[in-house]
């Protein structure tokens, strides 16, 4: 029994994780202990949520993570709309790994999950990341339904939404998109 316990202590590395909920229209996120060296065996997820009618724009001002093949050790992963937008690691992109550089990322909807994960061996003093996010208004008037404009006649976009209107002599239907004479 003692051998099993020693084996578990020696070879099992527990990753400590936590989740942060963010609902402000803009903000800053950073790896734990930034700008100092980030800790080993840490996972933190920031769930960023905006009101309907907005997406989320995020860019990195500092990025210095351990480089590993396909970012399997330390990484920042961004997910939105059920899809992985990017998995980032290292300092510069290679043929199999991506670092953010000057790239700006956009969520697919009003939610963005950003997960930072470190393994058990940050031996070279990597300092992690700093990123800034903000809400971006969706221009619903540019969207299409079945390849048709969202409004029959006029579409009016405003922060967080839109409305349709009709030419003089036409009436807007209950669906608030279709116009008839």
Predicted feature descriptions by range:
Residues 2-181:
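Domain-level representation of secreted and single-pass membrane ectodomains enriched
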């Amino acid at each position: 029994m003692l051998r099993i316990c020693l084996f578990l202590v020696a070879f099992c590395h527990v990753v400590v994780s936590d989740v942060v909920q963010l609902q402000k229209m803009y903000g800053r996120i950073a790896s734990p202990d930034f700008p100092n060296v980030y800790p080993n065996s840490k996972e933190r997820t920031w769930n960023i949520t905006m009101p309907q009618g907005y997406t989320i724009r995020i860019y990195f001002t500092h990025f210095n993570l351990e480089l590993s093949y396909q970012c399997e050790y330390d990484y920042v992963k961004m997910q939105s709309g059920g899809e992985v937008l990017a998995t980032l690691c290292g300092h510069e992109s290679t043929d199999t790994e991506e670092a953010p550089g000057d790239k700006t990322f956009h969520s697919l909807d009003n939610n963005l999950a950003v997960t930072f994960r470190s393994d058990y061996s940050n031996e070279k003093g990597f300092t992690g990341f700093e990123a800034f996010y903000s809400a971006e208004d969706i221009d619903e008037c540019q969207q299409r339904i079945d390849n048709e404009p969202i409004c029959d006649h006029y579409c009016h976009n405003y922060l967080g939404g839109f409305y349709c209107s009709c030419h003089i002599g036409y009436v807007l239907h209950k669906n608030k998109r279709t116009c008839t004479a």
